[in-house]
């Protein structure tokens, strides 16, 4: 047994600048390729809220109030931030909903982004009032500028209508036995759409309105959509909507906010479509089951989810894939849940797992999403809610908030390093097969991505409180095997067929192996 001699920095001496790394360089004439990119796990997705992405908080109180000299986020002032995303290795921008939002029974002073109030109007709150263009023209300019940088653009479409819409278009909504529209789960600001009419047939008005929304988004040039709570609408509904979209753009992507293990938030009002049926309807992908990752304690919790997603992908001839969901706007900040160690682990899982990485605005610098105005009474409001409603530690989708940014500037360098490695090792991390390794400690997971004689090995400790020791069993590993550290704390001890590691709480280690056979 001996301690391997490592050549530190070997991998990164071979890396190149991040210029045009995540996105293709500017193209003459845009050609959407997002479905192909996503199926091959080659998209790197960055989610942002136009309301906040270009906002300027001049007095540092976290809330954006123009009367106090602040600037609200708009499509136009979001454009300058796009170039920075390409430097981070991003190639796909995911916009949280940009449609008009309701003002009645609202949550927050701007209203939830998901309280849909119009199928064919963008939110006037995202318009630059100092510019003569319409908000639709400004949105198209944003998309065009993204495309010039090689960035694809997808838009989130809500699953339910606002209370305002339920008053204006009652025939679109389910009614209970008392004739009242239905609140799904505890989403008190929205009402549940009626998918089937009284004869058990698809509600044509709803289908046509969703098609109208797709047309509006295609008219401004976007490359696809993410469907919120997609499973509360059935196969036949989505089949019609997706077929409609693909007549104009065969590469127009549909990503379902759905997961094989999730349950119906409105089960008494309808069935919940399965992920395979959504994929059969034409969806290109869904959410991996990572929302509760910080609650995982056993290696099997990680491995079984990877295998489940790979099984579904295989059933669809590898033409469908998943989007990472470790840190979306629905979860508390990674920093709140587990600090920098959890942030590092989730970053490297995004980089090395067979899925499409996803990062929320503010993630790169470790935003806690804790706002100074949290649930305080507001002096002014654009809705009937006069409180700054937010979920503690979660990305604000209810108010005019500051641009997300954390207090961990040093994390940006770590993020860029991880993304550089992802692109440098893409032949392994994109094209390589997934290999599970057994470990001697149930809280330690280990796997490899292998292509030919090269492999990337990832080892992580799910114990959030204690340092642990573990053996990782790697068939045919030799004392003389060439191992280069990508991310490492204490060097492992290597003997035939085994790596012995010591891992701090939530520590992840990453190695590049050459000339391996396992």
Segments predicted by a language model, with ranges:
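Asparagine-centered strand-capping/turn motif at beta-strand->loop junctions
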Residues: 459-464
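Active-site-adjacent "subsite" loops/lids of carbohydrate-active enzymes
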Residues: 163-222, 230-231
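C-terminal beta-strand-rich structural cap/linker in extracellular carbohydrate-active enzymes
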Residues: 494-518
